[in-house]
Amino acid sequence: MKTLYRDNKGLHRWLFACGAVLVLFYLFRGNRAAVNFWVYSVTLPFEQFLGRACAALPFSVAELLYVLAAVTAVVLLVLMVHYLIKSRQKGRAAYRCALFVLDLFLTVCAAFSLLWGANYYADDFCDRSGLSPEPVAYDDLVRVTQYFADHLAEASMHIARDENGLFTADRQEILNYADTVYDCLYDEFPFLDMPDQKPKGIFFSKIMSAMNFTGFYFPFTGESNVNMDSPAMLLASTCAHELSHQRGITSEQQSNFLAVLACTRCDNANYNYAGWMLGYIHLGNALYRVDPDAWQQIRDSLPDEIVLDLRYNSAYWAQYKGLTATVTQSLNDKMIKSYGDELGTQSYGAVVDLLVNYYA
């Protein structure tokens, strides 16, 4: 046993170092003051620095790292298989390979916990703003859903449509506007004020669609990344959602709420439409679950072109329903819950409580 440890001393020290970081993380995660200092004075400024550095490049560094990681994984697998075949002491060789893989995995876990996981235990948007997702009354839900439907119809009059009647816009122009979309919220929520880095479009966006993702924030580069293949009508609200993560906000319900608020208040027609659309979709889904007739009445009041956009969006995502999307969303749900967010991916729907309480 001593020989086994001595022969792999570096790998064992690496393992203990990662383990120590994770233990310290779980010990201190309940100390709100310490976590707030770590998030808002250390990691958030560091991620903003990374984001500014990566912003100079015209492509997503996060996507490049994912591709390099996949290629590296294949190369390492081949090398380890070759090493195991050639080794005379296959048990020791297998142990060394397993230890190396474990070290890599724990390194990623430790780094992710420090850069992003800590945010789940810091003061969130609701803590800092005083807003709270309290349970909502039925009448308020109906009224706010109708309010969003009316404003969605108004916003629809100011956007462009293609020959099929669907929403159309230059996707790059939507991305270019994103770094100003939060300007309208700084007076009400001054703690949100920070320089934004424009979201990056993902080249392999169809893979994101297969995984049922419209966007993601990558803390290792400070970049917000968005799906450029999914329906354009919600691209603007996706950009706003991902930019909320640049501010250290982890809760998906709070990020969606901020996306709706920022998009509907800014002076860009495409963002206005996406914001009212995102809010209506969440509110409409909630209303449908409690009163399908009330939902149908509001749905029938929408202009035909909006219904066309909604149907196109549903049809697009329907083609990607399958094992890949199910597994990916399940893993994402478990990851979010592992950091104390009991709603997991369902927190995307809890945005309804915030919207109704705010607009009622």
Question: What feature does the model see in each segment?
Answer:
Residues 20-83:
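Membrane-embedded alpha-helical segments of integral membrane proteins
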Residues 58, 235-256, 260-261:
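Active-site recognition of the HExxH zinc-binding catalytic motif
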Residues 74-78, 92-126:
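Transmembrane alpha-helices and immediately adjacent membrane-cytoplasm interface residues
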Residues 139-143, 148, 250-294:
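Post-HExxH zinc-binding segment in Zn-dependent metallohydrolases
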Residues 305-360:
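Pan-zinc metallopeptidase signature
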